[in-house]
């Protein structure tokens, strides 16, 4: 998993 993928899962509002 990539860093941005983890961030996206944690904060899906970060379109």
Curated annotation (Swiss-Prot):
Query: What GO molecular function annotations does the UniProt record carry, in alphabetical order?
Result: rRNA binding
**Keyword match Ribonucleoprotein:** yes
Q: Is Membrane among this UniProt entry's keywords?
A: no
Which superkingdom heads the taxonomic lineage of this protein's source? Bacteria
The regions listed as transmembrane in this protein's record are none
Which keywords accompany this UniProt record?
Ribonucleoprotein, Ribosomal protein, RNA-binding, rRNA-binding
Q: Name one GO cellular component term.
A: ribonucleoprotein complex
What does this protein's UniProt record list under function?
Binds together with bS18 to 16S ribosomal RNA.
UniProt family annotation: Belongs to the bacterial ribosomal protein bS6 family.
The name this protein carries in UniProt is: Small ribosomal subunit protein bS6
Q: Which organism is it from?
A: Geobacillus stearothermophilus (Bacillus stearothermophilus)
**Lineage, uppermost ranks:** Bacteria, Bacillati, Bacillota, Bacilli, Bacillales
